[in-house]
A protein has these predicted regions:
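C-terminal segment of classical bacterial N-terminal signal peptides
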Residues: 14-23
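Positively charged, low-complexity intrinsically disordered regions
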Residues: 4, 23-24
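Acidic, glycine-rich flexible loop segments
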Residues: 88-146
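N-terminal secretory signal peptides
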Residues: 25-94, 126-127, 145
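Bacterial N-terminal signal peptides that target proteins for export
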Residues: 1-11
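Exposed, low-complexity/repetitive linear segments and helix-based recognition motifs
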Residues: 24-25, 99
Length: 146
């Protein structure tokens, strides 16, 4: 049997072996606060997927906009009351070609509630152009993967 064929068979065997399926199991959504707290404190690579349409606009009963996104939790704080706080920021350009800085912050409460805040800033003056806040739940609107 040619060497490249043997290498292909070996690669396929490793790729599809039961040992390689462990990563898929570890990447399942994790629906509770305690598991999330343990994951961040253990230094796990945590990602959040958010679906704002499954959340509510803060202080209202209206659903959020049909926007989905994800982020990797690079830094976090577990505060004295147990709140897990993390944030991200990025520079982007709006559809009208206006450059903006977007600051997104999240707070995960011990009861499984997730508060999502977004602030859009003028990149030259840091003036606030728009703010919005949403209330989500772990497993409904906000899912965590590690």
């Amino acid at each position: 049997m040619p060497r490249y064929a043997l290498m292909g068979i070996m690669s396929a065997a490793i790729l599809f072996s039961p040992l390689s399926s462990h990563r898929a199991i570890a990447d399942e959504p994790n629906p509770d606060y305690a598991a999330l707290e343990k994951a961040v404190l253990d230094g796990r690579d945590v990602r959040m997927v958010i679906d704002l349409s499954a959340c509510q606009v803060h202080d209202s009963d209206k659903s959020g906009p049909p926007v989905k996104g994800s982020l990797r939790v690079d830094g976090f704080m577990v505060q004295a009351d147990g709140t897990i706080a993390f944030a991200t920021t990025h520079f982007t350009v709006r559809p009208d070609k206006t450059p903006v800085n977007e600051f997104l912050s999240y707070r995960v409460r011990t009861n499984g509630k997730v508060e999502a805040h977004t602030t859009v800033l003028n990149p030259a003056t840091f003036a606030v152009l728009r703010e919005a806040a949403f209330d989500c739940d772990i497993g409904k609107g906000a899912t965590f993967h590690w």
